[in-house]
UniProtKB/Swiss-Prot annotation:
One Gene Ontology cellular component: cytoplasm
Binding residues annotated for S-adenosyl-L-methionine 1, in chain numbering: 10, 70, 103
Name of the protein described by the UniProt record: Heme chaperone HemW
Organism annotation: Haemophilus influenzae (strain ATCC 51907 / DSM 11121 / KW20 / Rd)
PANTHER family the record matches: COPROPORPHYRINIGEN III OXIDASE (PTHR13932), RADICAL S-ADENOSYL METHIONINE DOMAIN-CONTAINING PROTEIN 1, MITOCHONDRIAL (PTHR13932:SF5)
GO terms, biological process: porphyrin-containing compound biosynthetic process
Keyword entries, A-Z: 4Fe-4S, Chaperone, Cytoplasm, Heme, Iron, Iron-sulfur, Metal-binding, S-adenosyl-L-methionine
Positions annotated to bind [4Fe-4S] cluster: 16, 20, 23
Disulfide bond sites: none
SMART domains: Elp3
Gene3D superfamilies documented for this protein: Aldolase class I (3.20.20.70)
Amino acid sequence: MPKLPPLSLYIHIPWCVQKCPYCDFNSHAQKSDIPEQDYIYHLLQDLQADLQRFKDSIQQRKLHSIFIGGGTPSLFSAESIAYLLKEIKKQIDFEDNIEITLEANPGTVEAERFKGYVSAGIMRISMGIQSFNDDKLQRLGRIHNAAEAKSAVNLAKVSGLKSFNLDLMHGLPNQTLEEALDDLRQAIELSPPHISWYQLTIEPNTMFAYRPPKLPDDDALWDIFEQGHQLLTMAGYQQYETSAYAKAGFQCKHNLNYWRFGDYLAIGCGAHGKLTFPTGEITRFSKTKHPKGYLRGEYLYEEKNVPKIDRPFEFFMNRFRLLEAVPKQEFEDYTGLSQSAVKNQIDFAIQQNYIVENADSWQITEHGKLFLNELLELFLTEE
């Protein structure tokens, strides 16, 4: 019988001011007034339905973290966020040291709103900066400029937040090594507790997919990563996940729970959740993507059981994104499988120097990080 992992809650707010050309998230450009109050009502109804539907999994569990993502959640007022969190707490208990994060766009925040979010219960803000180069920001379709980004960061510092994150991208259209490193230097100078540093990828069904920009080649990308990683490390940021760097004590609890194969409720348009049951079942589910259907009360879109044969791949796909060692006991606890179920794959991975092991854990190697896809393919099941 699996041990139940920590339980988080993801809340999706789908609206944004305009759709960015690289974005493949479930986001909808704001064409008129956002039905803020109506949407909050439906989020709470959605949660209530899930707590009833999945009551055998939830039982007496408390929320470990909450992440409000989008879209651009900072389009919603602090009053709405305060009401939402207060009503959620009436339905399910919070752990004493819960982490509550809200995503914000530097172009949609101002001093009073940040302070209002803190009063509402937000402890951590994640800001979509992406770049401090105005030309690059324009090419990415962002609505803020570098000066507004820095202003937003400075507001975050004095707002009473426990932590904040800056999202930055590299490998941007026509970006040079020096431009990429300059973005990082400017971010480091602002001294955020956490930096997420992603490589831009062209996703299907985005504007960039239809009209692909010229991106740096693989050699240039490697130089950017290698020198950027060195810059961040020297500035006191520790890499703990493929794209995540944090000062000591400021790792994102919510994302760590995802990557450690934890459980998470999910409410809002297109949100995806995962729950483990005392019976050993693991369920994944998703919500109606379009706001029109969701606002009609059509919440649950799909629910499916994760068969035991698929669990090793799902577990390691998440776990090997982290640089920390993987406790063998957690594999058994969270998948309901014994280590013998993956012995052949593990032995081969060790032979290929993708991972090393000791009595208690498996650890991905530097070589394994470079060949992550090949490592994960070992755990894929044949159709």
